Design a protein with these regions (language model features):
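Electropositive polyanion-binding surfaces
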Residues: 23, 163, 173, 179, ...
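Charge-lined substrate channels and their catalytic hotspots, especially those that engage the 3′ end
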Residues: 1-272, 281-327, 358, 366, ...
């Protein structure tokens, strides 16, 4: 019936009543008419139709100003409706009773093609509020519940039975039973995460808030019992023996789930690069609970020092991990690369290896940067230097075609044994880290190119062209801020974006400007539609190299086995993959964003926790953002805090087109990129808040 309704309304630009629609359907029985009404309401909830106050229906796509999507509310109380091609901003005054996570219909107030369209919530189509994370609090003489998410402006009444075992301060997950009033819900406690003062509960609470599963089901645990701890002789049949090759791994000091190993030979003018990836698909097979669990999670989550794996540690740290001096099953991509960094030949095949050594970035960087050879690395020093040569060649080739290096630093939180943040250090991408990145990109491109040439259904990692208007807005903004732009932006290509970024690379405020440009661009996603990867300047790109921690990589391995190793390219297989991979791509993109948001929330919380011990201390920072309510300042350790406008000396006006605050007498101006000195005045772990004030001299002037 839905298809018939869509056909009827396809050409209609005005709303149609049920009777109007039924004139074309010729339904006569009351039962059929009731079914029609139910179908129309269902299609409205799904966002296919718009229903007016007069109960008239039209296709949503035929309306000029209506869109549907999930509402995401940020800390400021404002929201964004996730729509294609652009998210729509919704001011807190225009939410119309909608809460974070609602599926809504939004009416656009500005033009649809505006760089940042704005709208208001017209209808709440679906409220998918099932579970909420929060804290058990004292409510007079009884126990109550307070959601951790302040954006969820709701009241909750808990059933008495479910409160058994709960005490004040417990972090819990509740199940919503039903809505019993406007934004008021009856619920029950589903799970006690732990007491808020217990080590690690803060991180597990954020994981729960993002619906990240921290435990595996009994069904998964049962399947694990049938997976061996060692590779058998039978497993080696049909695989190429690479155990005599000089193959090793390079990872962080504390890495336990090792899924990539490398090898290299310099043969005349060319290099032979081997990238050998753990064959997780040999153990996590379609149709198993392990596979379904991996699909559901989509990715491993790295929350400070807590790893929540996509597959159980028994596999990720065991038989799937390329540990040294043990035989492991792999899928190898061996490439012949010329002196210009071009792949001139390659082979992709099932293999087995025995890693010679588990190396660390720290020790590899000593060899490559300082020519110091740590103990135990002597047999590998020459090979590492050859790898360095090849990595330099590959990087130069990437840069020549427009590879964009945003140079964004990342933080690492150091915690004590009780899980308290005691230090923040920058993750430095040294020579070894860049080497591995270059090798993995080469393998990912080679695998993607091969399947693309076969014209078979596949899952790609894609990055669309940036919106020209957003790039123009960025350049106009930085010009207003006083920066000169020499790059010709008439045609936006990776090379022009690279040139634009390089104009600021030597400036102190480069990281801030780079981040602003990055936010002007679209996000990389997974897709079956191969549009290339703009940021990498790649025509074909996929994720092949991390099947332990990313479901798309696991899927790519399964497809390689199907298409290349088993030669199953029949129409049934092709048709199945064509449909199934769309779901994999969409779900994987969603779980990736969710994991990144959880990681960001943990980082913000731990930064605030760290700064609680540094209230009253002075720091130098750079203004990273300017709003009508103050300045955001980023310190050298990447902690960002707010200097509220009320703490500034005098009256200031916000100039949005210049991202500046200017004093009433025009003598003082604060803009993005300015260096300032601040003092920490407040830090709150629960709210993930850090507040600063500008440091002043004896005359009241900021330094």
């Amino acid at each position: 019936m839905k298809d018939k309704i869509i056909e009827i309304l396809k050409e209609e630009t005005k709303g149609q009543s049920i009777n109007d629609i039924n004139k074309n359907l010729h339904l006569k029985s009351m039962e059929d008419i009731n079914m029609l009404e139910d179908t129309l309401n269902e299609m409205t909830t799904e966002g296919i139709l718009h229903k007016s106050k007069n109960h008239e229906y039209m296709l949503l796509e035929n309306t000029k100003s209506l869109k549907v999507g999930k509402l995401r509310i940020n800390k400021s109380g404002n929201g964004f409706v996730e729509c294609k091609p652009e998210d729509i901003f919704v001011h807190s005054n225009d939410l119309n009773g909608a809460i974070n996570g609602d599926f809504v219909e939004v009416e656009i107030k500005t033009r649809l093609n505006d760089p940042e369209p704005e709208g208001y919530i017209r209808n709440i189509l679906k409220r998918d509020l099932k579970k909420v994370v929060g804290e058990i609090v004292k409510d007079k003489k009884t126990l109550g519940f307070k959601p951790d998410d302040e954006k969820l402006n709701i009241a909750v009444k808990l059933t008495k039975e479910s409160l058994k075992g709960c005490v004040e301060g417990h972090k819990v997950i509740i199940d919503i039973i039903k809505e019993i009033g406007n934004r008021t819900f009856l619920a029950k406690v589903e799970k006690i995460i732990g007491h808020k003062n217990d080590p690690g509960v803060d991180i597990l609470t954020i994981a729960a808030k993002h619906s990240i599963e921290t435990e595996f089901s009994e069904a998964v645990k049962e399947e694990l019992k049938n997976i061996p701890d060692e590779v058998s002789e039978a497993d080696l049949i049909g695989r190429t023996d690479l155990t005599n090759e000089m193959i090793f791994t390079i990872d962080g000091d504390d890495t336990k789930d090792i899924d990539d190993a490398i090898s290299v030979e310099h043969t005349g003018k060319n290099y032979k690069l081997g990238v050998h990836i753990a064959d997780v698909s040999n153990y996590v097979k379609v149709g198993t609970n392990l596979y379904e669990s991996a699909f559901s999670r989509g990715t491993s989550s790295y929350l400070a020092d807590t790893v929540i794996p996509m597959i159980p540690h028994q596999l990720s740290n065991g038989i799937c991990s390329l540990n040294p001096e043990v035989v492991r099953l792999t899928i190898s991509c061996v490439m012949t690369i010329d002196g210009n960094g071009k792949v001139i030949d390659y082979d992709i095949f099932p293999s087995y290896i025995k890693s010679r050594k588990q190396m660390t970035y720290k020790n590899v960087n000593k060899i490559l940067d300082e020519n110091i050879i740590p103990e135990g690395y002597e047999p590998f020093a020459d090979t590492l230097k050859t790898m360095h040569e090849l990595a330099d060649i590959l990087r130069k080739e990437k840069i020549s075609r427009g590879y964009i290096d945003f140079g964004i630093d990342e933080d690492k939180i150091i915690q004590d044994k009780n899980g308290k943040a005691i230090d923040i250090v920058k993750r430095v991408q040294g020579t070894g880290e860049k080497l591995i990145e270059d090798f993995m990109i080469a393998a990912n491109e080679t695998v993607a190119t091969h399947i693309s040439n076969m014209d078979l259904p596949f899952i790609y990692r894609v990055h669309d062209l940036p919106n020209a208007e957003k790039i123009e807005d960025f350049t106009n903004l930085i010009k207003q801020m006083g920066y000169q732009v020499h790059t010709n932006l008439n045609k936006i290509t990776p090379v022009t974006m690279q040139k634009l970024l390089n104009e600021f690379r030597d400036k102190d405020e480069f990281v801030i400007l780079s981040d602003m440009l990055l936010r002007s661009m679209k996000k990389a996603i997974y897709s079956t539609n191969n549009i290339g990867h703009f940021g990498l300047a790649s025509k074909n790109y996929t994720h092949f190299t991390s099947p332990i921690r990313r479901f798309p990589d696991l899927t790519v391995h399964r497809l390689l086995r199907t298409y290349l190793f088993e030669n199953r390219i029949d129409m049934e297989t092709i048709n199945f993959n064509a449909k199934y991979l769309i779901d994999v791509a969409e779900h994987s993109s969603e779980t990736e964003v969710n994991a990144i948001e959880a990681e960001r929330d943990v980082l913000d919380m731990k930064m605030a926790e760290y700064m609680m011990d540094h209230i009253g201390e002075e720091y130098t920072g750079i203004i990273s953002g300017v709003t009508n309510f103050g300045l955001f300042v980023e310190l050298d350790n990447l902690v960002e805090g707010l200097v509220h406008i009320s703490t500034l000396n005098g009256y200031f006006t916000y100039i949005p087109e210049m991202l500046s605050l200017i004093s009433f007498d025009k003598k003082t101006k604060y803009r993005v990129g300015d260096k300032v000195k601040v003092v920490v005045t407040n830090a709150n772990k629960e709210g993930a808040i850090v507040d600063f004030e500008l440091v002043r001299d004896t005359n009241g002037n900021s330094k």
